[in-house]
């Protein structure tokens, strides 16, 4: 379909619609600003103002003040080299003749650099993926930077550090989700100091991406810079993203010309400016940070256990614990295996204790004397092969576990771990270790800062990518706050501090196995410095003289041991497991994170002692005491080994399936993640109650740029507390058969793991859950006091919840290192209706306020002591997850009570009532008995909103959304429904045939159907389908106008409501403005709708009339013989506009009426459903009345069309035959007959008016009565305060709208009924038009569906075909031919009775009753036949032979023929004749012999169906397209039709653009030029109607000139010499002789004399060919031709003897004028007229 609006009109319409939408939005905002505020609930602290600063370690960027890169800013910094060199360095290079010129290379904008990209909102998975897709889609990779743009790190707040091109940064700034973009300053990459203490130490450079050629290129450039400083730089590749750099002097020792400080500054400033560098930091020096200790680790808060297999049944069996340290003395009995040697750099799982021992180029395969590593391994898992020896009592904690060891030192040298820590952890992980112990680390050269380094990020990264691995690291032994080892600040590790051991240890094991000699050596140096005479004292001398000189006791080992024992004896409260070791490093980290996480025993820990690289067995016979095999050491290193061993045992507990029953169950075998192990360890820790408590932050001096927070249940000294495994690690055995909820000391405990509700999920199915930004999940547990325990003393109920997640690695240069922020909140609902929230910070809060959440740590915990039965709800929320989704582990435990998983999470407290946010109003929710909120019940609505009793919500009657709902929604649903319905009908019909191939150029598709087929909706849709877009726009505009109109009464009612309380007219300002705007909208859109629909109406009637006219002129000849021209013109002129008005009006009326009806219906039911039901009680009655009305209307409309057609027919016949009317003086008779017809029209129209008026009056009376009832009942409801007076007024106005729309919709049905009569007549013509079939298969389908057969079959809608007359020379009886009023179609609609018999006009006057019966009979005939006789459409073959040239040879072979209108009469019988080119042939015979029929068959006016073929140039004309055939054939009839046009136009009619020369030449050949020249205007003379200004002979010569001008090979002449004077006959005869040259001429004549000169004459008689030959040959035969010739000759002689004029002369004066009118009459009835036939038949394609 085509859209027929110009672009200007479309722009105008679009602009107006856009204007209305903008106004709607503004109104919505205006009204929303006046609406009441409703309660808002906070979600994840969104009510706090977001901090949008970018927090880097070296800089804080305020993005509100610092300008962002804009999309119109491109700064090109061209440089030949990949390296961007600062001005000072560029100057140095220039001084060293190293040219670096700016070439203005446009590729500079494609060079990558670091940018900070801040998002407008919190980063989630979607926005992060959008950034990734943008970087991939817009990336350009250069040869000098062979890596892709990508996200490097997350930086708080809401930012990413991104490596991308400058062009990408500019493009990215236009994204709506980006708020700020800035270049990453090189100074933010540098994190090192330049002083004598640190100078010369290696510096590590973290790269953003790997590059192979980087080192050599950088070294060359930097060494050229350092020449003038007499220094060099050495770069070493650590891994693909890490370099080590050392700056050194060229000389062996520093000289005045070598300044390392200045050299380093230049080097690292230059490196920081390179796009590949990401982070630069100084290398740090690494340092190293039990028979009684297990009793503490597996004890409880107040009770210790025995170090045996009863109280500690699990010892890490099946687990591999990895340790990296100074070395391991493999010959020690704790580690040696009599069967296997220690596996060096290989894996042997069969070794009793050590499965692998990994060494590097900087380490060996042993430990130094008293080595740190051997002691750590012994504390963790060492045990002798023979467990019966006494020394086994000093075995490690996880004695059944095996060790994977990584040696970090060689001999007595310091630790040198791999620069890439992944190279340390990966081989241990591959060996099967899942728990790792690191009791070493480094402290920043800048002091105690708790900094986060690249090593720290590397540890976090390894744990993030290996989620089932956990690392435990020593906090350090530096005793101050912020003194944590750098690697221990990693977020994902378990950082372990040290607390003291049990009091017994200070009296026995510790004093016995401490290496006092190291202390003596140190103290003796101090004494020597004090007094030189003591420098050479031995320990014996110190002991001997200690009484005299007190200070000498410090170099006496015996006295040192005694001092330890004495201190423990005298101060038992200071020396026990409840105190922190004074040396243990304390938190927080530099960004305020809480470290350590846990503490474990770390003072005087006795374990394996290394004797260095020897093969002796230090254990001896295993007896005690054994100082060669055992050593007591203090430090967080020792604590870490115990914590790692405990974690290993915990992992065994889960992996072997002990949880939760305490016995091994196969389905309970759980594969824990590192975060789960960490969460369980922290969750079951106990805060120490000793003398070392957390000092308040007010008394501590912290660096000014640090942030510190307090946490409930944790401290910066001991983290979440000391490890106490027996709090929940429950194992059932023969000696200790405790149940799951009871430990050995009787404390009941329940442990729950998030996502592992044992009623629903088995442990072996467990996996971590994950969250993204904005998501949350909840875990709920119930608590009831235990019947077997009291809430006093140590039995106080307690719940602890812990949340842990493995956070992605942070950028080391960020101020805060948390990337993904999850938040844990505990909610419980009390019986008194209050709701209490707990979080990791700030304790509890009430009354719906969200608690303060932790934004720093990836560990959150909540501790609570319940006092009453309750249900806990723990909610984990993804507050900010830029690198999501984030996996997490949640652990809950409850003790001293009965705990279990809740069936469902509670939402409220019993009896609690809460204001709930409802749309556009305020509601309340009640807490039900199951602690769930009920649905929100609306209490009140905001201003400009009202409660919708149907939808049960507050609706805003004028808002942008509401307008869209009514207009857009209503329009689309309505139009889509109608179109789908019609398309469905169309689809059903298309299964039979695809009708769209019947388009004839008008854009209207009409599928041929049977003559009795009803007009369907699909048929009607085909008529309006070309205009559907315009109609849709018009309908949409009308709907907008309607929507605006139905909104006005509501505001009118509001004004009335507010009048009593209004104090000033200005109070109604907004309502008046809204009503005015609505009125303007209604006016504008109704005008547009009317304008478009008016144009569509005219377009449609034009196209429909064109379509009908095309269908008429494409009909076969029989159609015009059977139908009256007046009736056909009435269909063309009257029915098509009526049908058009009905169709376009129906669509528009349905749309607007339905919209107004539905819209008003919404309002009236919203205002009062009771009044609405009162109204709708009468709708069925109104529908019934309308149905009765439509039935009468349908019949009366058909009758009206019948009488209108008769009046038109009579009027046209009178005008055409005016000569006859005047000649016989019958004017009065015709006036009376026409008046009778008009009277019938008037009477029918009056009855139709009475019918409609009566129905309308009844409906009006019912509506008015209903209005009275509604007003009465509405007033009653208003008095009862059920609604206001204003709403009553609005309701009444809307009722008017409903009535109006109902009337419109009922009227649509009436209009549809009225259109059926017109539609039936129009579609009868449209469906009968000949059409072409495209394929042979389609022809077969048409025949099967009853549509086949070709044109000419008499399958019209007459009841009887036998009496259909054909008026022509072939009419056998010729009845009526002498009647001057005869239209040569005597079998018209009006004079055929029901039986098909002819009726004659009765001369006798009829009575009124008889006249009435006759009218009813005529009406019945009309209703049955519709006034139109239709021959079934001709189905044209699917393919033709196209002629490009024609010789003019024609041959009839056995041709027989019957006219379609008279199938019972055979006109031709087995005709055989041949016409050759260049010759003239004559056809003679009496009237009705078939002469003219032969000419019509040559022109293919009728198809042959009774046998035979007509061959032209050896081609059957049935296979030649009709128009193609007629392009070589021209026919001149006896009574030629001339158009009311100039002579030039009449002669050149057959040509598209004839020249005057061609016209004159044709006129000369036709001997018409002479008389044309004598006319006043010559060839421009207008001939009048049917050529009335010319005589008969002149008209025939003009017709012959037209045929000559057509330049066609075959000339058919039908009686062209009849009724002419001798002069005209002679001129025409000469013309024929001219035409014969090069043409095939066939003449038909009654007079044989007219054809005597023809080359051959064919004689026909009663349809048979009786003779053929030349004139002489036929005369000699004395046959039919001879008799006809002699009869004519005798008649001519008789007339001459009598002195009377011949027939030609007589007719020349009188008949020619009559012929003008008769010709016109005959042409209207299509009586074989040459020119009319050429036009009427048209192109049958």
Swiss-Prot record:
It is found in: Membrane. Residues 1697-1734 have a biased composition (Low complexity). InterPro entries: AAA+_ATPase, ABC1_TM_dom, ABC1_TM_sf, ABC_transporter-like_ATP-bd, ABC_transporter-like_CS, Galactose-bd-like_sf, P-loop_NTPase, Peptidase_S8/S53_dom. Residues 1334-1403, 1697-1741 are annotated as: Disordered. GO terms for molecular function: ABC-type transporter activity; ATP binding; ATP hydrolysis activity; ATPase-coupled transmembrane transporter activity; serine-type endopeptidase activity; serine-type peptidase activity. Disruption phenotype: Cells in which tagC is disrupted do not form SDF-2. Null mutations in either tagB or tagC lead to a cell autonomous defect in prestalk differentiation and a 5-fold reduction in the expression of the prestalk gene ecmA. Disruption of regA in a tagB null or in a tagC null background results in higher levels of sporulation. In the C-terminal section; belongs to the ABC transporter superfamily. ABCB family. Multidrug resistance exporter (TC 3.A.1.201) subfamily. This is Serine protease/ABC transporter B family protein tagC.
């Amino acid at each position: 379909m085509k859209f027929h609006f110009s672009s200007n009109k479309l722009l105008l319409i679009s602009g107006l619609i856009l204007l209305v939408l903008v106004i709607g939005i503004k109104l919505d905002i205006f009204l929303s600003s006046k609406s009441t505020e409703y309660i808002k609930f906070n979600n994840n602290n969104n009510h706090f103002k977001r901090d949008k600063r970018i927090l880097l370690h070296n800089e804080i960027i305020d993005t509100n003040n610092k300008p962002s890169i804009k999309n119109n800013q491109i700064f090109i910094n061209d440089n030949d080299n990949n390296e961007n060199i600062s001005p000072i360095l560029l100057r140095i290079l220039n001084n060293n003749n190293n040219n670096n010129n700016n070439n203005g290379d446009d590729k500079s904008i494609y060079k990558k650099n670091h940018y900070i990209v801040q998002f407008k909102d919190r980063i989630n998975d979607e926005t992060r993926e959008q950034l990734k897709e943008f970087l991939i889609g817009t990336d350009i990779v250069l040869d000098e930077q062979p890596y892709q743009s990508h996200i490097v790190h997350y930086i708080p707040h809401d930012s990413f550090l991104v490596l991308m091109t400058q062009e990408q940064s500019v493009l990215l700034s236009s994204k709506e989700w980006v708020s700020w973009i800035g270049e990453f300053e090189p100074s933010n990459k540098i994190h090192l100091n330049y002083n004598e203490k640190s100078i010369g130490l290696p510096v590590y450079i973290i790269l953003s991406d790997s590059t192979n050629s980087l080192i050599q290129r950088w070294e060359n450039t930097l060494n050229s810079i350092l020449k003038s400083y007499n220094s060099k730089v050495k770069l070493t590749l650590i891994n693909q993203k890490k370099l080590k750099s050392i700056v050194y002097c060229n000389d062996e020792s520093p000289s005045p010309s070598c300044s390392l400080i200045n050299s380093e500054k230049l080097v690292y400033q230059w490196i920081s400016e390179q796009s590949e560098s990401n982070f630069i930091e100084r290398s740090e020096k690494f340092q190293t940070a039990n028979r009684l200790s297990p009793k503490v680790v597996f004890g409880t808060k107040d009770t210790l256990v025995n170090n045996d297999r009863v109280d500690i049944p699990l010892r890490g069996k099946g687990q591999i614990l990895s340790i990296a340290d100074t070395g391991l003395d493999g010959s020690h009995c704790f580690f040696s295996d009599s069967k296997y040697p220690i596996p060096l750099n290989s894996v042997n799982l069969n070794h009793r204790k050590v499965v692998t021992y990994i060494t590097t180029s900087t380490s060996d395969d042993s430990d130094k004397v008293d080595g740190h590593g051997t002691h750590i391994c012994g504390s963790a898992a060492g045990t002798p092969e023979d467990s019966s020896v006494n020394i086994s009592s000093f075995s490690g904690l996880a004695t059944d576990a095996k060790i994977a060891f990584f040696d970090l030192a060689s001999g007595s040298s310091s630790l040198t771990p791999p620069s890439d820590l992944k190279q340390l952890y990966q081989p241990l992980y591959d060996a099967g270790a899942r728990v790792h112990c690191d009791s070493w680390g480094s402290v920043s050269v800048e002091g105690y800062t708790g900094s986060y380094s690249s090593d720290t990020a590397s540890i976090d990264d390894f744990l993030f990518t290996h989620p089932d691995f956990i690392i435990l690291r020593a906090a350090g032994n530096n005793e101050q706050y912020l003194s944590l080892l750098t690697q221990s600040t990693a977020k994902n590790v378990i950082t372990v501090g040290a607390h003291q051991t049990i009091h017994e240890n200070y009296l026995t094991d510790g004093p016995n196995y401490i290496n006092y000699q190291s202390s003596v050596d140190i103290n003796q140096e101090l004494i020597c410095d004090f007094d030189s005479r003591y420098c050479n004292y031995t320990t014996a001398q110190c002991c001997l003289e200690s009484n005299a000189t007190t200070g000498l006791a410090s170099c006496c080992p015996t006295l040192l041991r005694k001092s330890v024992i004495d201190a423990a004896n005298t101060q038992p409260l200071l020396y026990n497991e409840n105190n922190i070791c004074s040396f243990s490093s304390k938190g927080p980290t530099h960004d305020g994170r809480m470290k350590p996480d846990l503490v474990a025993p770390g003072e005087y820990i006795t374990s394996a002692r290394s004797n260095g690289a020897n093969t002796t067995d230090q254990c001896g016979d295993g007896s005690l005491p054994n100082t060669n095999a055992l050593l007591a050491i203090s430090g967080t290193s020792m604590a870490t080994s115990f914590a790692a061993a405990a974690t290993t045992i915990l992992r065994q507990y889960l992996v072997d399936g002990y949880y939760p029953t305490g016995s091994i169950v196969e389905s309970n075998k759980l594969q824990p993640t590192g975060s789960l192990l960490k969460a369980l360890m922290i969750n079951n820790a106990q805060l120490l109650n000793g003398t070392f408590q957390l000092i308040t932050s007010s008394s501590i001096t912290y660096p000014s740029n640090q942030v510190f927070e307090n946490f409930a249940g944790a401290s910066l000294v001991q983290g979440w507390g000391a490890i106490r495994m027996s709090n929940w690690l429950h194992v059932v055995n023969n000696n200790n058969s405790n149940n799951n909820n009871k430990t050995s000391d009787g404390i009941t405990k329940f442990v729950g793991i998030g996502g592992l509700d044992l009623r629903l999920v088995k442990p072996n199915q467990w996996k971590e859950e994950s969250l993204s930004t904005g998501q949350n999940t909840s875990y709920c547990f119930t608590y009831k006091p235990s019947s077997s325990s009291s809430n006093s003393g140590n039995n106080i109920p307690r719940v602890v919840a812990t949340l842990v997640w493995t956070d992605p690695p942070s950028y080391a240069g960020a101020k805060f290192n948390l990337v993904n922020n999850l938040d844990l909140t505990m909610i419980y609902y009390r019986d008194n209706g209050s709701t209490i929230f707990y979080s990791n910070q700030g304790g509890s809060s009430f009354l719906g306020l969200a608690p303060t959440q932790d934004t720093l740590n990836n560990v959150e915990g909540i501790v609570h002591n319940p006092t009453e039965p309750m249900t806990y709800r723990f909610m984990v929320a993804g507050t900010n997850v830029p690198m999501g989704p984030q996996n997490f582990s949640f652990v809950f435990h409850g003790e001293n009570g009965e705990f279990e998983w809740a069936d469902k999470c509670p939402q409220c407290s019993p009896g609690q009532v809460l204001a709930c946010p409802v749309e556009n109003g305020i509601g309340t929710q009640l807490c039900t008995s199951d602690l769930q909120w009920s649905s929100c019940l609306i209490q009140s609505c905001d201003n400009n909103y009202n409660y919708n009793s149907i939808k049960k919500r507050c609706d805003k009657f004028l808002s942008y959304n509401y307008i869209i709902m009514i207009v857009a929604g209503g329009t689309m649903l309505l139009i889509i429904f109608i179109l789908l319905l019609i398309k469905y009908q169309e689809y059903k019909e298309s299964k039979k045939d695809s009708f769209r191939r019947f388009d004839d150029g008008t854009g209207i598709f009409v599928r041929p159907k049977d003559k009795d087929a009803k007009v369907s909706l699909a048929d009607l849709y085909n008529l309006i389908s070309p205009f559907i877009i315009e109609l849709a726009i018009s309908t949409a505009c009308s709907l907008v106008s309607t929507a605006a109109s139905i909104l006005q009464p509501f505001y009118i009612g509001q004004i009335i409501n507010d009048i009593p309380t209004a104090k000033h007219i200005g109070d109604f300002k907004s309502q008046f403005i809204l009503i005015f705007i609505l009125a303007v909208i209604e006016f504008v859109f109704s005008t547009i709708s009317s304008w478009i629909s008016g144009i569509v109406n005219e377009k449609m009637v034009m196209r429909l009339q064109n379509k009908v006219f095309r269908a008429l002129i494409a009909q076969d000849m029989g159609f015009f013989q059977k139908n009256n021209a007046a009736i056909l013109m009435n269909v063309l002129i009257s029915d098509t506009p009526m049908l058009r008005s009905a169709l376009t009006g129906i669509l528009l009326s349905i749309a607007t009426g339905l919209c107004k009806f539905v819209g008003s219906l919404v309002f009236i039911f919203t205002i009062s459903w009771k009044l609405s039901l009162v109204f709708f009680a009468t709708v069925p009655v109104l529908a019934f009345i309308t149905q009765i009305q439509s039935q009468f209307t349908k019949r009366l409309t058909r009758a009206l069309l019948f009488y209108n057609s008769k009046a038109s027919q009579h009027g046209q016949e009178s005008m055409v035959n005016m000569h006859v009317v005047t000649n016989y003086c019958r004017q009065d008779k015709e006036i009376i007959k026409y008046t009778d017809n008009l009277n019938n029209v008037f009477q029918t129209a009056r009855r139709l008016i009475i019918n409609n008026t009566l129905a309308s009056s009844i409906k009006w009376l019912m509506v008015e009565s209903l209005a009275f009832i509604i007003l009465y009942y509405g007033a009653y409801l208003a008095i009862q305060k059920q609604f206001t007076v204003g709403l009553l007024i609005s309701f009444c106005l809307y009722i008017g709208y409903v009535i109006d729309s109902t009337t419109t919709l009922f009227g649509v049905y009436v209009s549809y009924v009225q259109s059926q009569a017109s539609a039936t007549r129009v579609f009868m013509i449209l469906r009968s038009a000949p059409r072409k079939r495209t394929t042979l298969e389609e022809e077969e389908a048409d025949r099967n569906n009853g549509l086949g057969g070709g044109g000419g079959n008499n399958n019209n809608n007459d009841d009887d075909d036998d009496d259909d007359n054909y008026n022509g020379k072939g009419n056998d009886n010729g009845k009526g031919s002498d009647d001057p009023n005869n239209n040569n179609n005597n079998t018209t609609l009006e004079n055929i009775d029901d039986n098909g018999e002819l009726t004659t006009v009765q001369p006798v006057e009829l009575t009124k009753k008889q006249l009435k019966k006759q009218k009813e009979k005529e009406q019945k005939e009309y209703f049955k036949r519709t006034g139109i006789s239709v021959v079934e459409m001709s189905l044209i073959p699917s393919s033709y032979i196209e002629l490009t040239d024609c010789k003019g040879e024609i041959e009839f072979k056995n041709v027989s023929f019957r006219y379609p209108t008279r199938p019972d009469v055979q006109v031709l019988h087995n005709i055989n004749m041949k016409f050759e080119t260049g010759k003239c042939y004559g056809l003679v015979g009496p009237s009705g012999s078939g002469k003219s029929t032969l000419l019509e068959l040559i022109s293919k006016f009728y198809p042959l169906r009774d046998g035979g073929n007509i061959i032209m140039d050896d081609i059957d004309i049935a296979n030649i397209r009709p128009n193609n055939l007629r392009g070589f054939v021209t026919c001149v009839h006896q009574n030629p039709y001339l158009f009311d046009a100039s002579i030039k136009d009449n002669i050149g009619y057959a040509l598209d653009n004839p020249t005057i020369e061609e016209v004159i030449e044709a006129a000369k050949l036709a001997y018409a030029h002479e008389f044309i020249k004598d006319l006043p205007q010559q060839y421009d003379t207008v001939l009048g109607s049917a050529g009335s200004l010319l005589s008969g002979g002149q008209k025939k010569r003009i017709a012959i000139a037209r045929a000559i001008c057509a330049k066609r090979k075959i000339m058919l002449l039908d009686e062209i010499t009849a009724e002419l004077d001798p002069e005209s006959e002679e001129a025409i005869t000469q013309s024929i002789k001219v035409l014969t040259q090069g043409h095939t001429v066939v003449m038909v004549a009654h007079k044989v004399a007219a054809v005597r000169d023809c080359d051959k004459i064919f004689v026909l008689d009663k349809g048979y060919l009786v003779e053929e030959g030349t004139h002489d040959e036929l005369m000699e035969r004395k046959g039919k031709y001879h008799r006809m010739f002699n009869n004519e000759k005798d008649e001519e002689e008789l007339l001459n003897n009598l002195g009377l004029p011949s027939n030609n002369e007589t007719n020349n004066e009188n008949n020619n004028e009559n012929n003008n009118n008769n010709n016109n009459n005959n042409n209207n009835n299509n009586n074989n007229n040459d020119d009319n036939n050429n036009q009427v038949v048209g192109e049958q394609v």
